[in-house]
Amino acid sequence: MHRSESSYCREETTLCQGVNSTWVPPADTVPEVSLIPSSPPAPDSPAPSPKPGYGFSTCEEKHGDPRIRRPMNAFMVWAKDERKRLAQQNPDLHNAVLSKMLGQSWKNLTSVEKRPFVEEAERLRVQHLQDHPNYKYRPRRKKQAKKLKRMDPSPLLRNEGFTRGQPMVNLSHFRNLHPLGGSGELESYGLPTPEMSPLDVLEPSEPAFFPPHMREDTDPVPFRTYQHGMDFSQEKTMREISLPYSSSPSHMGSFLRTPTPSAFYYKAHGGSPVCTPLGQLSPPPEAPALDAMDHLNQAELWGDFDRNEFDQYLNMSRTQRPGYSFPMSKLGAPRTIPCEENSLISALSDASTAMYYTPCITG
């Protein structure tokens, strides 16, 4: 017999009246005292099952149900008794070894020997289908604790060995690093020689030779000015420099008449070009000089250029020792050129020289 909802409310109001007050059950719930002794409950009567209204839901009953096993196949039917027999004969063998032995023995059986077990497995499948018509196979999910237990030891060991030496660097430190080209920390160390400097094209084992009249100290023109003045002829100049040359004086003279990029880099406003010694780096470009040369155009640069400056390169070629090659020989390996190619190269060199001198003559 279950109590109604109103009886619970009366009990709560009675308990809240005071501590010293005694609880008196309501009249409808007072059991009647009978002189006749009540008979004990029968032992076979089942205990009353709780109803869902008192905290027991259908979900809890569903979880409490035993898991429905899948029907056994023919191998499982055969191995059920065979495993017991092997375990009794070999009590020291591990279960994995027994499974391997059972699998090998099942493969060695013929189809006639397997037939009774196959028929028994089919009978079990039909019986299972009748007992559980709505059965749907749901594989058990692996517990995450076991997976984490297998994965945890290696990182812990690595962390313990790493923290003894030095603290671990946060990965965000490498993401926040700026590119090497854009960092301002390298500016305080000074920049090396520019890209087209004559010192860059020399081999480390080759000594440099400079005439005495070329060792005067003057300020070099910034490298950006060289790029501004030589953009129109960069492609043709590099194509001519990459061509191999012969040892004939006529071809060497025509080749040296063409202004080299390094010559224009070191001096663009007249005067002799300057080459620093090998052990000394050229200073980095200065910002004030760079801003002052931005407004100059191509005609002004070539108008102030000294035409007789290239004689110094011819003098250097005459005083150069025979054992040393031209500094630009690093770009193209020296080889002998046939006679029919000498005239073509000389004509191309003269045409490029005329193109260089045209702004100087007309301006």
Swiss-Prot record:
Residues 149-210 are annotated as: Important for transcriptional activation. GO terms for biological process: angiogenesis; heart development; lymphangiogenesis; positive regulation of transcription by RNA polymerase II; vasculogenesis. Residues 70-83, 94-106 are annotated as: Interaction with DNA. It is found in: Nucleus. Expressed in the adult spleen, lung, heart and kidney, and at a lower level in the adult testis, liver and brain. The keyword DNA-binding applies. Residues 236-362 form the Sox C-terminal domain. The keyword Nucleus applies. Residues 68-136 bind DNA. Pfam families: HMG_box, Sox17_18_mid. GO terms for molecular function: DNA-binding transcription activator activity, RNA polymerase II-specific; RNA polymerase II cis-regulatory region sequence-specific DNA binding; sequence-specific DNA binding. A motif (9aaTAD) lies at residues 308-316. Residues 20-66, 129-163 are annotated as: Disordered. Keywords: DNA-binding, Nucleus, Transcription, Transcription regulation. Probable transcription factor. Binds to the consensus DNA sequence 5'-AACAAT-3'. Also binds 5'-CACAAT-3' and 5'-AATAAT-3' with similar affinity. PANTHER family: SOX TRANSCRIPTION FACTOR, TRANSCRIPTION FACTOR SOX-18. Binds target DNA via the HMG box domain. This is Transcription factor Sox-18A. It comes from Xenopus laevis (African clawed frog). The gene is sox18-a.
